[in-house]
């Protein structure tokens, strides 16, 4: 596993790290509270695709917010570097986890399973990139995040046919929120509290997709 600098980029100030940790700590609590409602709703539907999809989505959300909270709360050192790798890897898992209820619960069939396989293959590649390669560049990782997120455009036609307008709005709003936040993620070394702003966009995107899954994919 490659070594990351103890104080990446310019480093976040103590105040920034506190706000970063609190923001995603709140997101973690919300995810833990919201998950039972999501799972119970899927179970009531009695559909295996919905149950698996919502379970994977929920687990990926909890993992991301837990990893992020621990990373930003931990003091500089070896453990913090490890949490940073886990946090960045969890972004790939969250993206794939968000696809899962859509591919298994809504799209289904050969197309749904193919997209499911492709997106999880990319997620595994992204995790390996973060964990094992010294040459892993943040720009490459960010581009892969965006590629995975917007790969869903190939499914626009079947989604239009199987999802109401409100569901498509939530799907798009969540994707646009994540994408807009990437600008602050990429420039947080130059923008004070830019990483906090990124976190707020992530929370907004997750919220949109939570209600998308609750109302239309479970």
Language-model features and meaning:
Residues 1-218:
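Multi-pass alpha-helical transmembrane bundles in non-GPCR membrane proteins
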């Amino acid at each position: 596993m490659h070594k990351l600098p103890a104080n990446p980029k310019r480093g976040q100030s103590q105040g920034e790290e506190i706000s970063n940790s609190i923001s995603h700590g709140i997101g973690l609590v919300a995810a833990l509270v919201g998950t039972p409602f999501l799972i119970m709703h899927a179970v009531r539907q009695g559909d295996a695709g919905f149950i698996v999809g919502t379970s994977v989505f929920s687990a990926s959300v909890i993992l991301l917010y837990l990893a992020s909270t621990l990373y930003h709360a931990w003091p500089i050192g070896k453990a913090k570097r490890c949490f940073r790798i886990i946090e960045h890897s969890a972004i790939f898992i969250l993206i794939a986890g968000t696809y899962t209820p859509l591919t298994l619960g809504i799209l289904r069939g050969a197309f749904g399973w193919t997209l499911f396989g492709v997106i999880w293959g990319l997620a595994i590649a992204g995790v390996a990139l973060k964990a094992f390669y010294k040459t892993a560049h943040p720009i490459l990782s960010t581009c892969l995040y965006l590629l995975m997120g917007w790969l869903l455009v190939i499914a626009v036609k079947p989604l239009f046919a199987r999802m109401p307008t409100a569901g498509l709005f939530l799907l798009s709003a969540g994707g646009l929120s994540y994408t807009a936040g990437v600008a602050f993620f990429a420039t947080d070394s130059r923008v004070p509290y830019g990483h906090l702003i990124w976190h707020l966009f992530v929370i907004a995107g997750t919220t949109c997709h939570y209600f998308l899954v609750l109302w239309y994919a479970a």
